């Protein structure tokens, strides 16, 4: 049987077929949030992690591949062994001039952390740091599996979005709460490293306590010490833990960028 479909219909299905890969995230298939505006009218929108990169906020970064110029080579590269006071492996030595891509570009190339990367893109301030070649960052990037296994999606906590909706929150209030949740999740996994050692403290041989962006933003005063992320090295393996439970997880892979390093781990530092 031959179907003579209108050209418009054929184009529609061709477009859907072409877009399909960008909407499939394994367990995280396209999810729609239903909410009411101030007039009680129902709306639907894509969950933040399902929004195609750079479509959620076009002002985030206008540079291709996250490239924002050359790094000041007088700035030393982030070196985990310097932070830990451990012996450096030769294969981890980093030459910035051979790897000009920023961490934002590196994140986009690691398939195993694309859910986390999508959250980073939806936190404008942090995204710009990740894209800046003259920042020095340590990104603890949870795998897609780790994020998918959370009982709530990162945009749903700690602000209780369901409760806000049932209490009649406005669209603006919901957007603000969701953005706060996204920012807190992202910033709980990123450390802004500086060489004056304000961002880390050695707690034992080969083990260092780091301060995430979220931790530093939540501090009541600059004199407050401590941290929320533990990083250690045993033999040739790096491990990461939350300071809350001190349960260490092995770093599965390390990616070096012009402005820091990405440590891929199969767990999240914060949860519902």
From Swiss-Prot:
PANTHER family: FAS1 DOMAIN-CONTAINING PROTEIN YDR262W. Its main location: other. InterPro entries: FAS1_domain, Mug57-like. The keyword Cytoplasm does not apply. This is FAS1 domain-containing protein YDR262W. It is found in: Vacuole. Present with 4846 molecules/cell in log phase SD medium. One of its GO terms (cellular component) is fungal-type vacuole. Residues 1-26 form the signal peptide. Residues 100-269 form the FAS1 domain. The keyword Signal applies. Keywords: Signal, Vacuole. It comes from Saccharomyces cerevisiae (strain ATCC 204508 / S288c).
């Amino acid at each position: 049987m031959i179907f003579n479909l209108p050209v418009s219909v054929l184009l529609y299905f061709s477009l859907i077929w072409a877009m399909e890969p960008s909407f499939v995230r394994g367990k995280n298939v396209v999810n729609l949030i239903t909410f009411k505006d101030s007039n009680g009218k129902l709306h639907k929108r894509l969950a933040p992690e399902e929004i195609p990169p750079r479509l959620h906020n076009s002002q985030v970064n206008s540079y291709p591949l996250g490239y924002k110029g050359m790094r000041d080579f007088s700035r030393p590269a982030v070196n985990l062994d310097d932070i830990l006071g451990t012996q450096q492996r030769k294969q981890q030595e980093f030459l910035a001039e051979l790897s000009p891509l920023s961490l934002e570009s590196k994140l986009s190339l690691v398939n195993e952390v694309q859910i986390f990367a999508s959250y980073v893109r939806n936190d404008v301030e942090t995204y710009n740091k990740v894209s800046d070649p003259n920042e020095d960052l340590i990104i603890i990037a949870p795998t897609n599996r780790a994020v998918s296994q959370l009982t709530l999606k990162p945009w749903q906590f700690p602000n209780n979005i369901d409760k806000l909706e049932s209490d009649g929150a406005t669209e603006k209030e919901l957007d603000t709460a969701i953005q706060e949740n996204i920012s807190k999740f992202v910033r709980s996994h990123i450390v802004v490293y500086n060489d004056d050692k304000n961002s880390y403290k050695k707690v034992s041989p080969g083990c260092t306590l780091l301060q995430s962006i979220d931790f530093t933003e939540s501090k009541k005063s600059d004199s407050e010490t401590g941290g929320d992320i533990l990083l250690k090295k045993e033999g040739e393996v790096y491990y990461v833990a939350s300071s809350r439970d001190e349960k260490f997880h092995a770093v599965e892979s390390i990616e070096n960028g012009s402005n820091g390093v990405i440590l891929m781990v199969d767990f999240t530092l914060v949860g519902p």
